[in-house]
UniProtKB/Swiss-Prot annotation:
EC id: 1.13.11.5
Biological classification of the source: Eukaryota, Viridiplantae, Streptophyta, Embryophyta, Tracheophyta
Alphabetical list of SUPFAM superfamilies matching this protein: RmlC-like cupins (SSF51182)
Pfam families reported in the protein's UniProt record: HgmA_C, HgmA_N
Organism, scientific name: Oryza sativa subsp. japonica (Rice)
Protein name: Homogentisate 1,2-dioxygenase
């Protein structure tokens, strides 16, 4: 077993856990390289007749060969044995009952509903039944199809044990994982990533990985996109700097294990179903690699938020961390948006999020703290879904407290909170088990029922004959 050191040109960040040091490479979209053993990367070519130290050269392609160079993604892996050395795949038994990869109307386990939905945090079983990341993963909603290479799925997970003797591979799309409770130590073919709550990790389509739980039970959120990949959003008039900086995205350095592992299992998600194949070695046998298609993580506290500085509430798109675009300019298959600590300074302005009906669909989660638009009921580890054109906005308590504040024009710092949103142009279908879940808040609608009319003809407002003008 070997622990990598970064190449001399790499920028590194180090984290310690149990005496181990994790070294990372900096930069989203960069062409990176890493060697766990010096001299194992071929020089000047990708697939020599005989690779250094007798390794096998294997390319992992994230885009078609003919994709434009600016969007072409691939990585060369130099490994002890190639991935193809395994027994045939078979459907996993027992099958996973709560994963979906196709959301058309014929999928009997999903329904369409415009109702506002909210879920309380799911309990994580402390020991029994044992659930690793794969078994603890379940789909909440989604749209499109992994077979048609267009769409997304939103999952949640609750796990109480590390993956042992197996690795997971998602052939359907990219995973963006948001841990809310408990660190994740993720071993990938490119190396290891330690991801605590407050950070995110992206595992691109096709990578094999295993999830360990160094702090014990963990839960969180997962978005999955079909047929495209996440990228930084355009900044437009913001300029060259701001929001998420490419240099703050960190990828692993090469790490490998050379051990005999009879019965090691590869669990492959394909079309939303799970298949298994066995082999006699660990898939984490990559001694060196180079390319621009790699797993990466990001610390959300490094996000540089923008906001209005005089009046009105900015649209939430100003808080986009990553986007998965469609072929229509400005229309996202899926945006990952956060609501981090920040200053609120707008004058004569209702500062919480405004009441809204949106052509996009919004799935929200809360990592910690209290969300500014919900005084109670929306808890860390919980979730909400407001689908296309479904009304939503601040609850009654938030509205009444905001408009009656005597210091409403004073600057205030929103702190101790971190919420996020997965937003998509595609209308989701919701899994029946999510609708039937005991965690579902069936009284969610009540948080708005108390909103009352403040309109009066006697308070200097407009009359029906004279429209309100300023």
């Amino acid at each position: 077993m070997a622990m990598a050191t970064a190449t001399p040109a790499a920028q590194n960040e180090q984290q310690e856990k149990g005496g181990l040091e994790y070294v990372y490479l900096s930069g989203l979209g960069n062409s990176l390289s890493s060697e766990a053993v010096a001299g194992t990367l071929p020089r000047g070519q990708n697939s020599p007749l005989v690779c250094p130290l007798g390794l096998y050269a294997e390319q992992l392609s994230g885009t078609p060969f003919t994709a434009p160079r600016a969007r072409n993604l691939r990585t060369w892996l130099y490994r002890i044995k190639p991935s193809v050395t395994h027994e045939p795949f078979h459907p996993r038994r027992p099958a996973h009952p709560r994963l979906i990869g196709d959301f058309d109307r014929t999928t009997t386990d999903t329904v369409a509903t415009p109702t506002q939905l909210r879920w309380r945090p799911a309990d994580v079983p402390p020991h029994h039944p044992p659930l690793d990341f794969i078994d603890g993963l379940y789909t909440v909603c989604g749209a499109g199809s992994s077979f048609l290479r267009h769409g997304y799925a939103i999952h949640m997970y609750a796990a109480n044990k590390s993956m042992d003797g197996c690795a997971f591979c998602n052939a359907d799309g990219d995973f963006l994982i948001v841990p809310q409770q408990g660190k994740l130590l993720i071993t990938t073919e490119c190396g290891k990533l330690l991801v605590p709550p407050g950070e995110i990790v992206v595992i691109p389509q096709g990578f094999r990985f295993a999830v360990d739980l160094p702090d014990g039970p963990s839960r969180g959120y997962v978005s999955e996109i079909f047929g495209t990949h996440f990228q930084l959003p355009d900044l437009g008039p913001i300029g060259a700097n701001g929001l998420a900086s490419a240099r703050d995205f960190l990828s692993p350095t090469a790490w490998f294990e050379q051990v005999h592992r009879p019965g090691y299992t590869i669990v492959q998600k394909y079309g939303g179903e799970l298949f298994t194949a066995t082999q006699d070695f660990s898939p984490f046998n990559v001694v060196a690699w180079h390319g621009n298609y790699v797993p990466y993580k990001y610390d959300l506290s490094k996000f540089c938020p923008f906001n209005t500085v005089l009046f009105d509430h900015a649209d939430p798109s100003v808080n986009t961390v990553l986007t998965a675009p469609t072929d229509k300019p400005g229309v996202a298959l899926l945006d990952f948006v956060i609501f981090p600590p920040r200053w609120l300074v707008a004058e004569n302005t209702f500062r919480p999020p405004y009441y809204h009906r949106n052509c996009m669909s919004e799935f929200m989660g809360l990592i910690y703290g209290i969300y500014e638009a919900k005084a109670d009921g929306f808890l860390p580890g919980g979730a909400s879904l407001h689908s296309c054109m479904t009304p939503h906005g601040p609850d009654t308590k938030t509205y009444e407290a905001t408009i009656s504040r005597p210091d409403a024009n004073e600057p205030s710092r929103l702190s101790g909170t971190l919420a996020f949103m997965f937003e998509s142009a595609l209308i989701p279908r919701v899994c029946q088990w999510a609708l039937d879940s005991p965690s579902r808040d069936l009284d969610y609608y009540q948080c708005w029922i108390g909103l009352k009319s403040h309109f009066s003809h006697d308070n200097g407002g407009a009359t029906s004959e004279e429209p309100c003008r300023k």
